[in-house]
Each structure stands twice: as C-alpha cells, then as structure tokens.
Design a protein with these regions (language model features):
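Soluble "head" domains of membrane/secretory-pathway proteins
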Residues: 7, 25-28, 37-218
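Hydrophobic membrane-insertion alpha-helices, especially the h-region
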Residues: 4-22
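Aromatic-capped interface at the extracytoplasmic side
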Residues: 16-35
C-alpha cells in the first residue's frame, strides 16, 4: 500500500516537472540591474528565474524578461502600461520619485545605496531623472507630450530595473513592445539553492497550481 502511494506520488511529481519545463524557460540573471531582488549576494553567484512564456497578461510590478536587439534578453519590472502617463519628479520629502498618472508611487523594492553626503539623490531616483529628462527625451521625443511627461503607447510597456543606478531599461531603450516580452517570471531559484530542494518545494507547496492558472492569462 505504502509502495503504491509512493509510486503514485513520484509519477505526479514527474508529470508536474514535465509540465513546468514545457511552459517555462530557465534564465540565469546576469548583472546587478535587479538588485536587491536578484543577485544580491554576489559571493554565491547568479540567481536563476523561470519565465512563464504562456502568460501574456502584464500587471504593475510584474518582473518580465524582454528580448532586445543586439544583446542578451534583459530582466526588468513593469512600471507602466499602455495609456499611462509617466514622469520623474522631485518631491521635497523623498527626493526624486516616479509619478504614474499624476500619483507618486512607492517602490519598496528599490536598491537604496547609502550615501550620507548625497542621501536625497541616493534615496530617490536621481539617475532615472537624468536619463528620463535627458537622453530618453532626446532619442525618443515621440513618446513625450508638450508637458514633458511620457505617454506609454498602445501595445507597449514602460519597464525599469530595481537598481536604478545601474540599469539599462526604458530610460535607455524607450518603451518596449509587448511582442518583445518573452514572459513573466514565475519562480526564482537563489544562487546556492539546490535544484532538488527547489523542485520539491514547488510541488509540495502547490505553486504549480499558480503556474497552471497563469498559463491561461491571454
């Protein structure tokens, strides 16, 4: 009896893993643009993400993998969706911040570099501000209104890296077409975490149900 249950469980795990490998693509995260979310512990190596290529619905805060010309795919966070109005503004209390549709947004996932002599800029988005109102506006004037604010075109998204001090994202490339998006990050495996433990947790925690549901997001 116990043997039959164990055998059935092994078959179930095998089927789940086959399904997982079919709908996701394994990507190794390279670089520091998404710290502290990924590659925060440089001594251990690079983190790995699993991208659901069937999930075509993108929400604020989703982490996505984007195909860009003449280089490897990049990993960024969705900041604004089609029709959204984006700006980078100066707030007296918090420094430079993102403004979406007239509202300042809180980004607790950002990498904050501590710099006592320049804490206002480091805590805010000074680098993003410079790129947004400088090279981006110069290279992609079609994205901007006369007010200086950016409007995300239909069928495109505005995405940024969490480490704004070291990220080539929409402030560099402009908005990304949705056809460039390889998929949404479904799961992550931290550097040093064994594959067996990762897959075991994926199955036993029932996370594969979320993967199945996300496959039907069109």
């Amino acid at each position: 009896m116990v043997g039959n249950v164990f055998f059935t469980y092994c078959i179930l795990i095998a089927l789940v893993l086959v399904f997982f490998s079919t709908v996701t693509v394994e990507c190794v995260v390279v670089g520091a643009s998404m710290r502290p979310k990924y590659n925060n512990d440089t001594k251990k190596g690079n983190d790995t993400v699993y991208v659901n290529t069937l999930n075509k619905v993108y929400n604020y805060g989703d982490i996505i993998v984007i195909n860009v010309q003449d280089r490897d795919p990049i990993i960024k966070r969705v900041i604004a969706l089609p029709g959204d109005v984006v700006d980078v503004v100066f707030d007296e209390n918090d420094g430079y911040k993102l403004e979406i549709n007239g509202k300042l947004i809180e980004e607790d996932y950002l990498l904050i570099k501590h710099d006592e002599e320049n804490i206002l800029n480091q805590k805010g988005l000074y680098t993003t501000f410079v790129h947004f109102h400088g090279s981006l506006k110069e290279n992609h004037p079609e994205l901007f209104m006369r007010s200086g604010k950016l409007v995300v075109p239909n069928g495109e998204i505005f995405a940024l890296g969490d480490n704004r001090h070291d990220s080539k994202d929409s402030t560099y490339y402009g908005t990304f077409k949705m056809s460039q998006i390889a998929g949404v990050v479904e799961l992550e495996r931290k550097a040093g975490e064994g594959e067996f433990k990762f897959y075991w947790n994926y199955v036993t925690n029932g996370k594969f149900f979320s993967t199945i549901a996300n496959c039907f997001n069109k």
